[in-house]
């Protein structure tokens, strides 16, 4: 990993303050990334943190922080959607708090070899971990209708059908291999608008979500973390786009007793929670970054922070 890469945790102070770590507490950092949330929790109280990340590079980077807190920080390579099994395999059956940052790590976005960005050329990969199909596998192998559905549902791309058709035409002549190659084809279909957003933005988001099954993972992670929280335990989540925030909002509304519509990923799981509130809300609406943070870190602009607390049994 290049030494020039860095990751700035978004809403770190607000998220950790909402989590309110206490001495001897056991906490989960479900999206370790650059370790910012874990470090803040460990500094805030003499607590134990279990940190999960599916990216082997993130786990490797975290070794230095783990060495500073040898008995308090424990790193786990895996998907946060599998956190229930990952923690129970290590003897962890209850948590005093859990925090998630559902955005893509800046380490991943800024490393061309990971294939997440259309701003720099790289292999068309987009995997957050080391296994599974790549974005190239999807654009070169999925049927046109399936591609269009992914772009529409996960990217909210209105030109999804035209983009899918252009992808299929181009791959018939030559398979896609790089991010620049795909972005160029998308830009022939979707022209820039006054917003200044690159025409490839929504399609790249959609492919990344499909590659990593992000939305289903988020739902599994929220359910699992909530099930492990002890009374008074807190669940805090930072989301970055409307699809993520919709899932977090629906889940937390259901957990606090508000009626929630079932998700297409989990048609019955979230709705079951509406009958008996198990949590109270920690926020009225959402917490968003202040001007100083968005100026220092433009990627923070779309961040939304929500939290809930487990009620006594």
Curated annotation (Swiss-Prot):
HAMAP family: 16SrRNA_methyltr_H. The gene is rsmH. It is found in: Cytoplasm. It is an enzyme of class 2 (transferase). Signal peptide: none annotated. GO terms for biological process: rRNA base methylation. Its main location: cytoplasm. It catalyses: cytidine(1402) in 16S rRNA + S-adenosyl-L-methionine = N(4)-methylcytidine(1402) in 16S rRNA + S-adenosyl-L-homocysteine + H(+). Keywords: Cytoplasm, Methyltransferase, rRNA processing, S-adenosyl-L-methionine, Transferase. NCBIfam families: 16S rRNA (cytosine(1402)-N(4))-methyltransferase RsmH. This is Ribosomal RNA small subunit methyltransferase H. The keyword Cell inner membrane does not apply. Specifically methylates the N4 position of cytidine in position 1402 (C1402) of 16S rRNA. GO terms for cellular component: cytoplasm. Pfam families: Methyltransf_5. Belongs to the methyltransferase superfamily. RsmH family. It comes from Acidiphilium cryptum (strain JF-5). GO terms for molecular function: rRNA (cytosine-N4-)-methyltransferase activity. Its EC number is 2.1.1.199. S-adenosyl-L-methionine binds at residues 35-37, 53, 80, 101, 108.
